[in-house]
Swiss-Prot record:
InterPro entries: RNF207, Znf_B-box, Znf_C3HC4_RING-type, Znf_RING, Znf_RING/FYVE/PHD, Znf_RING_CS. It comes from Danio rerio (Zebrafish). A zinc finger (B box-type) spans 93-145. Residues 577-606 have a biased composition (Polar residues). This is RING finger protein 207. It holds the Pfam family zf-B_box.
Length: 634
C-alpha cells in the first residue's frame, strides 16, 4: 500500500529515532488534525488514514498491525487525549480577538482579556465596561480569560451541573443530580474531586513506571538483538571457513557435499537474520509508541486540571495498562548459533575413509541471549534440587546432561527389547526395569501410608497407628539408600555404554533416550522420597502430641494385658462360687440370678470409664446384687 513508512536499516535500530514529537503525525509530519487511535496504539491524522481501509481492515503504516474498522470510509476512534493536548498547545500560541472591537491579544497576555460564558465570546477590558454595563447583562457570567475553563470538563453534560464527586466504580465524575440518581450501594464508591485527583495521580505514576520498565526492556532487547545479528554474521563466517577448510582436504570426493552444506549454512543464516530483523522491527516500532505515551502522560499532567484529568486520566491509565499487557516479543526466539553438522555429513560420505571422532555434545554452550534468558531458571532449578536431600547434590551434577525423557520411555524400551537380540544394553534394560518397578512400588506404598496418616490427622484428628510414622521414616531412608545405590550402579555403566553407542550409530538415539530417562526417573523417585521424608518429619510432632492426649484421656489403654487377664480370671472364679452355692435353689431362681449377674457384669464392663457417676451407680448395684446372692442360701 502506498504511504507506508519505510525506515532505513540503520535508522530502524537507532534508539534515538524513537524520540519524536508526540504531537506530530508520522505520515504527514504535521501537527495532528483529528487524531485517530489504531489498535496497535499508533496515532495518525484522520485525513492521512482515509482510503487505506481494505476488507474492513486498516493496516498500520508503522508496524503493519491490522485494525478492524466498520465500513469502507470508516475511521478508527478519535484519540481524545492527543486531541486535548493538541488543542492545549494551540490555545497557548493563537491570538484572541475581542468580539466587539476586534482588538487582538495573544493568549499569553490574558490579563487584559475577559470571557463571557453566557455569550461565549472574548471581550477586552474596555468593551467589558461599555457593552456589559447594562442591566440586561447583569446575569452574564464574565470571568478572566486566564481563569476560564472548559465547561465540558467542569459541568455534567446531562444535568448542566458542576461536578462534585467521583465514582471509583464507574471511573466517572458525578454532579449532585447524578449522585442522587445512583443506587445506595454505589454511593459507597464515591469520593470527592480532590481525593480522586490525588489517587488518580498515584495510579498514573504506577502505570508510567510500568511503561518505563517496558521501555528499558525493549531497549535492552534491541541492543541484544543487534549483538546477536553480529554474532550470526560472525558465526556464519566461522562456519563457512570450517566447511571450506574441510572441503579443501577432500575436494575430489566432497564437491557436491560442499554445495549442500554452504546452502544449509546460508539458509540458516537467512532464516535467523530474518527472524531477528522481524523481531527487531517489532520492537523498533514499539519504542515510538512508548515514547509518545510517556511524553503524553507528562504533557497531560502538566496541562490538564483536576476535572480534565478525571475526565480522561483513567482512559490514559487503561491505555497504558493495555500497552504493557500486549504480547511483546522481548526475548530472542532462536539462538545465533549456525550449526550444519558438517562433520557428520562429511563422515557419511566418507565413512570408509574417515575415523569417527567424538560426537558433538548434546548440550552445546548457549549464546549470550539464551544465557540471559535461562540463567535465572537454571539457578533456581539447581538450588531446588540440592536443598531437598544431601545425596541430591551428587546426582544433580549428572542431571545437567540428562535429557528430559519422553512420555513413551516405557513403550520405547519394550519396542527396543522386542527388536534386537541379546546385547549388553538389552540385559541392562531388563535388570533396570525390574529394579525400577520394585523401587516405584515401595515409593507408592510409602506415599499411600503418608496420605492415609495425613488424612486421619486432618479429618479425624486421631491416629490408629501412632508408631507408623517412625516406620515410614525408616523405610524412606532404606529406599533412599537403594535409589542411590541403583543410581550409582547405572551411572557406572555410562562408559561401557558410550563405547557401544559409538559402534552402533543407528540405535544410539533410542538407547540414550531410554538411559537418560532412567536416570531422570530415579531422580524423580529420589525427589518424591525426599518430599515424603520432609512431610513425614513435619507430621511427626503432631502424631506424638495426639498420642499423648489420647493416653491422658483414656488411662485404661496404658494398663498391661496381664492385668486384664487377671481380672477376667477373678470374675470367672466369682461366677463359679455363686453357681456352686446356688445349686440347692430351684432352677428358675438360679437361672434368674445367673442372668442378672451376667447382665450386671456385662454392663459394668461396657460402661464408659469417662462417666464417673454412671460407673459409681453400677458399682453400687453390683454390690447390692452380690449381697442378695449371698443371702439366698441362708
Amino acid at each position: 500500500m502506498s504511504g507506508e513508512i519505510f525506515y532505513s536499516v540503520d535508522n530502524l535500530y537507532d534508539l534515538d529515532s524513537a524520540n519524536c514529537h508526540p504531537l506530530v503525525c508520522h505520515l504527514c509530519q504535521e501537527q495532528y488534525e483529528h487524531p485517530c487511535l489504531l489498535d496497535c496504539y499508533h496515532t495518525f491524522c484522520a485525513s492521512c488514514l482515509r482510503g487505506r481501509v481494505a476488507d474492513s481492515r486498516l493496516t498500520c503504516p508503522v508496524c503493519g498491525h491490522q485494525s478492524v474498522v466498520k465500513g469502507i470510509n470508516a475511521l478508527p476512534p478519535e484519540d481524545r487525549l492527543l486531541k486535548f493536548l493538541v488543542d492545549s498547545s494551540a490555545d497557548s500560541e493563537e491570538t484572541v480577538q475581542c468580539a466587539n472591537c476586534d482588538l487582538e491579544c495573544k493568549k499569553q497576555d490574558v490579563d487584559a482579556m475577559y470571557y463571557c460564558n453566557t455569550c461565549c465570546q472574548p471581550l477586552c477590558r474596555d468593551c467589558r465596561e461599555t457593552t456589559h454595563k447594562a442591566k440586561m447583562f447583569s446575569r452574564h457570567e464574565i470571568v478572566s480569560l486566564a481563569k476560564r475553563t472548559k465547561e465540558a470538563h467542569k459541568k455534567c453534560a446531562l444535568h448542566e451541573e458542576f461536578y462534585i464527586m467521583f465514582s471509583t466504580e464507574k471511573k466517572s465524575m458525578l454532579c449532585i443530580n447524578c449522585f442522587r440518581d445512583m443506587q445506595v450501594e454505589s454511593r459507597a464508591h464515591c469520593i470527592d474531586i480532590e481525593t480522586a485527583y490525588i489517587q488518580g495521580c498515584e495510579k498514573l505514576d504506577q502505570a508510567v513506571l510500568a511503561v518505563k520498565e517496558l521501555q528499558m526492556s525493549a531497549r535492552e532487547a534491541i541492543i541484544l538483538l543487534k549483538a546477536m545479528i553480529g554474532e550470526v554474521r560472525a558465526n556464519v563466517d566461522e562456519e563457512e571457513s570450517a566447511i571450506c577448510t574441510l572441503f579443501s582436504n577432500m575436494q575430489e570426493k566432497l564437491a557436491e557435499r560442499k554445495k549442500i552444506l554452504l546452502k544449509a549454512a546460508r539458509s540458516q543464516h537467512e532464516e535467523k537474520e530474518r527472524t531477528f530483523k522481524e523481531q527487531l522491527s517489532h520492537l523498533a516500532a514499539l519504542l515510538p509508541t512508548l515514547q509518545v505515551h510517556l511524553v503524553t502522560c507528562s504533557a497531560f499532567l502538566s496541562s490538564a486540571n483536576k476535572f480534565e484529568f478525571l475526565d480522561m486520566g483513567y482512559q490514559l491509565m487503561e491505555r497504558l495498562k493495555k500497552i504493557v499487557k500486549l504480547p511483546h516479543r522481548l526475548r530472542p526466539t532462536q539462538s545465533s548459533k549456525i550449526n550444519t553438522e558438517y562433520r557428520s555429513e562429511f563422515a557419511r560420505c566418507l565413512e570408509p575413509l574417515l575415523l569417527l571422532g567424538q560426537r558433538r555434545s548434546m548440550s552445546t554452550t548457549g549464546s549470550v541471549a539464551l544465557a540471559l534468558g535461562n540463567a535465572s531458571g537454571l539457578m533456581q532449578s539447581s538450588l531446588s534440587v540440592q536443598c531437598h536431600s544431601p545425596a541430591m547434590s551428587d546426582m544433580s551434577l549428572c542431571s545437567s546432561v540428562v535429557r528430559r525423557p519422553t512420555s513413551h520411555r516405557y513403550i520405547s524400551t519394550k519396542v527396543l527389547l522386542a527388536k534386537g537380540g541379546e546385547t549388553p544394553f538389552m540385559e541392562h534394560c531388563c535388570n533396570y526395569e525390574n529394579s525400577y518397578r520394585t523401587l516405584q512400588t515401595e515409593i507408592q506404598k510409602l506415599k499411600d501410608q503418608v496420605q492415609e496418616i495425613h488424612r486421619d490427622l486432618t479429618k479425624h484428628h486421631s491416629l490408629t497407628k501412632p508408631d507408623s510414622m517412625s516406620e515410614i521414616l525408616e523405610k524412606s531412608v532404606q529406599v533412599d539408600s537403594q535409589i542411590s545405590s541403583e543410581y550409582a550402579s547405572v551411572e557406572l555403566m555410562r562408559a561401557m555404554f558410550e563405547e557401544i553407542w559409538e559402534e552402533t550409530l543407528q540405535r544410539v538415539a533410542n538407547e540414550q533416550e531410554i538411559y537418560e530417562a532412567q536416570l531422570h526417573d530415579l531422580l524423580q523417585l529420589k525427589q518424591e522420597n525426599s518430599y515424603l521424608t520432609t512431610i513425614s518429619r513435619q507430621i511427626g510432632p503432631y502424631i506424638r502430641s495426639i498420642a499423648k492426649v489420647k493416653e491422658r484421656l483414656e488411662p485404661r489403654l496404658k494398663e498391661p494385658k496381664e492385668l486384664k487377664d487377671d481380672r477376667t480370671e477373678i470374675m470367672l472364679k466369682l461366677y463359679e462360687d455363686s453357681t456352686s452355692t446356688a445349686d440347692t435353689q430351684p432352677s428358675n431362681e438360679l437361672s434368674c440370678n445367673t442372668e442378672d449377674n451376667w447382665t450386671l457384669n456385662s454392663l459394668s464392663e461396657e460402661t464408659n470409664p469417662k462417666n464417673k457417676d454412671y460407673y459409681r451407680t453400677n458399682k453400687q448395684k453390683n454390690t447390692t446384687d452380690s449381697t442378695n446372692r449371698k443371702e439366698i442360701p441362708m
